[in-house]
């Protein structure tokens, strides 16, 4: 029997649809993954080349290595919607690609896998031996090269994405390895550099204390300074009993000279909480940093402390909450796990993993795409319905024409395993 709460949810959802329609942008499905040879669970941010081709990875699928359902693939999607698998991981060359790839602007893609690589220090009975790899793939010829295999000790384990500087050096983070001190997981992660000769260097090893632990992929400025976030550590009075270690995470700077500084330690509640985030920071030309936290904010979120927020840290290090996602209206989305992209007008776009239509993925919703304008007004751009459009959106990419490209890790029709989509202005 319908309850008053269900009628209220339906009314609020309809009201948001009216707001979204007033600012309508056009959604198109570009590809639905089968979970077989073409992969499944696309999670990293898509890369667009000058010809309009999109490139990305799937966390699983492929040809059946890594037991069922496969170790993942690297794919290309041309402007006509034809998907080509550029590389299928087998375990020894990496497994389960995670995080964003980097692109040299010509032919080379660089990425990471969370597992695989065949070194013996990281063993999981459901996956191949290995602590992850850094790889290079020529998107034209298909030539694949493992540039570095992680051993799982001081060098790190479980890399989660890359960024490339103007000289061709690669930078990234590992969620494990490094120093001990992060709850039940033991090690706290590292920041790394791989130079153009293939030399791997640990630039910083986290302790899990006030400096943070479990870092998320970094961004780099023109001066070579790195910025990123951690999932734990910082304010150790926040979430002190977490099995992953105390603290709600940090925003940090690692200068080109090697000096480490915490720019902000999340305090939980209205200030935000990074636990379990995949979000990479967005760096603007003025040196301001923008990001999301999946938890925290102004309201309780179905028993969890807050539905997440969008924040800014200016070049002087001052932090500001720009927007808090609210459980008061589920249709506006909840839990922005995957960070931000922007357009030329200065709008910020995010995805929420939950929220939207509460009846599509009952009771939490299948996620939304949202726009935050320069006046702080948030608008729902698209609501996922768990039909052909998929569910649980991840990272977004924007182009110079104002188009948004993104992926969902699930849905896309019966027995489908995620989608690639486009939202045109």
Description of each model-found segment:
Residues 2-425:
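Extracellular beta-propeller repeat domains
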């Amino acid at each position: 029997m319908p309850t008053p709460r269900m009628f209220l949810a339906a009314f609020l959802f309809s009201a948001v649809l009216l707001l979204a329609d007033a600012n309508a942008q056009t959604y198109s499905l570009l590809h639905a993954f089968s979970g077989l040879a073409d992969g499944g669970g696309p999670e990293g941010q898509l890369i667009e080349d000058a010809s309009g081709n999109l490139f990305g990875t799937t966390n699983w699928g492929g040809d059946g290595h890594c037991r069922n359902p496969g170790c993942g693939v690297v794919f290309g999607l041309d402007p006509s919607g034809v998907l080509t698998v550029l590389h299928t991981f087998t375990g020894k060359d990496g497994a389960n690609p995670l995080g964003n790839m980097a692109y040299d602007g010509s032919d080379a893609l660089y990425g990471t896998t969370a597992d695989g690589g065949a070194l013996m220090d990281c063993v999981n009975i459901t996956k191949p031996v290995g602590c992850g790899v850094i790889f290079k793939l020529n998107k034209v010829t298909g030539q694949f090269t493992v540039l570095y295999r992680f051993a799982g000790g001081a060098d790190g384990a479980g890399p989660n994405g890359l960024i490339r500087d103007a000289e061709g050096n690669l930078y990234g983070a590992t969620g494990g390895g490094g120093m001990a001190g992060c709850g039940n997981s033991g090690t706290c992660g590292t920041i790394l550099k791989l130079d153009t000769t293939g030399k791997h260097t640990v630039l910083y090893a986290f302790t899990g204390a006030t400096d943070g632990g479990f870092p998320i992929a970094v961004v780099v400025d023109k001066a070579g300074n790195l910025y990123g976030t951690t999932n734990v550590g910082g304010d150790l009075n926040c979430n002190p009993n977490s099995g992953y270690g105390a603290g709600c995470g940090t925003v940090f700077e690692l200068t080109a000279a090697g000096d480490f500084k915490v720019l902000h330690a999340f305090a939980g509640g209205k200030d935000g909480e990074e636990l379990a985030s995949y979000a990479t920071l967005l760096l603007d030309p003025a040196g301001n940093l923008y990001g999301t936290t999946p938890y925290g904010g102004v309201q309780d979120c179905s028993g969890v402390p807050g539905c997440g927020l969008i924040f800014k840290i200016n070049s002087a290090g001052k932090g500001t909450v720009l927007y808090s996602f609210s459980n008061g209206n589920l249709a506006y989305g909840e839990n922005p796990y995957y960070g931000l992209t922007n357009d030329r007008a200065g709008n910020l776009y995010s995805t929420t993993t939950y929220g939207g239509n509460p009846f599509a993925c009952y009771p939490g919703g299948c996620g939304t795409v949202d726009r935050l304008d320069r006046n702080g007004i948030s608008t729902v751009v698209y609501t996922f319905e768990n039909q052909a459009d998929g569910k649980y959106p991840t990272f977004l990419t924007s182009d110079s024409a104002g188009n948004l490209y993104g992926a969902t890790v699930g849905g896309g029709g019966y027995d489908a395993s995620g989608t690639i989509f486009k939202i045109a202005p």
